């Protein structure tokens, strides 16, 4: 066919005249011919060559990114990722494309079930987006907000893994410190002004306070107590736990109140479900109303 003939002719020309001033023009034509002839991988290879040899920075950056896109579209993600990483290093000022390149790595490692590499790229995305905050877009903000929120999962795991053992004062102080750390990170997500992420952060903050209250109530008891002393100890634990449970409910209410402002998402729905357990007399009734909220807003 004509595209096969064009590819052959252009390839011969480049082999014979590698220094010719039309060499780069022939490369562009080859990319087009490969795509028209359904040879996307050959097109990608030629684009990589262009990205490494042409002086025009705009052309090299576009060629490199386009090559990565072609590899991705044809499920050669293992070849696309190094190109996207190179793009980020070589063209940090290409903000929109660099954001997408970061996100492509996150998606790739999520698919590969490689949690540590995914987390590494989430950290890179958050850091890169933050350092270029003047260029922030709705898209970059949304991606960074989601990455930053997911990065708090490891802090949540650390918090939940702290067992309240005797002496209670020491282990409780450790758990409270972990709580402050995660709450600080979740509150920091407000910079993204993302309604869903703020619902998620509010839900998680309330949940860690609720978890702390529960963990205090089921914490280890001293073995040497009499029945009366044990009852008194239980009362002391309830007094310790109560403020945290109250704080959790107050924070959950922030999500509940968002419904009246026209907001409803899965985190608000989960908030209603939790409140129905914590305060059933008031929220069992409200829970029946919430399925209609999505149609209202």
Give the location of each predicted region.
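Acidic, polar-rich low-complexity tracts and alpha-helical solenoid repeat scaffolds
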Residues: 1-297
């Amino acid at each position: 066919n004509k595209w096969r003939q064009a590819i052959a002719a252009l390839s011969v020309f480049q082999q014979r005249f590698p220094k010719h001033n039309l060499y780069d023009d022939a490369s562009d034509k080859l990319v087009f011919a490969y795509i028209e002839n359904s040879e996307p991988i050959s097109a990608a290879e030629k684009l990589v060559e262009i990205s490494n040899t042409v002086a025009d920075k705009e052309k090299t950056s576009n060629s490199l990114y386009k090559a990565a896109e072609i590899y991705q579209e044809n499920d050669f993600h293992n070849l696309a990722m190094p190109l996207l990483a190179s793009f980020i290093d070589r063209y940090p000022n290409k903000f929109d494309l660099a954001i997408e390149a970061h996100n492509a790595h996150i998606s790739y490692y999520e698919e590969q079930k490689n949690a540590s590499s995914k987390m590494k790229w989430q950290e890179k995305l958050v850091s890169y987006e933050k350092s270029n905050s003047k260029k922030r877009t709705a898209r970059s903000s949304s991606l960074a907000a989601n990455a930053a929120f997911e990065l708090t999962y490891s802090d949540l795991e650390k918090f939940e893994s702290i067992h309240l053992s005797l002496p209670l004062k020491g282990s409780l102080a450790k758990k409270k410190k972990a709580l402050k750390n995660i709450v600080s990170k979740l509150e920091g997500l407000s910079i993204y002004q993302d309604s869903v992420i703020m619902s998620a952060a509010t839900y998680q903050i309330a949940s860690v306070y609720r978890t702390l209250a529960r963990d205090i109530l089921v914490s280890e008891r001293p073995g040497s107590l009499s029945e009366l002393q044990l009852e008194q100890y239980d009362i002391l634990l309830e007094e310790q736990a109560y403020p945290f449970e109250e704080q959790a409910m107050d924070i959950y209410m922030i999500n509940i109140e968002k419904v009246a402002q026209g907001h409803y998402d899965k985190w608000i729905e989960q908030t209603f479900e939790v409140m129905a357990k914590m305060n059933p007399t008031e929220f069992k009734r409200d829970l029946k109303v919430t399925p209609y909220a999505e149609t209202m807003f």
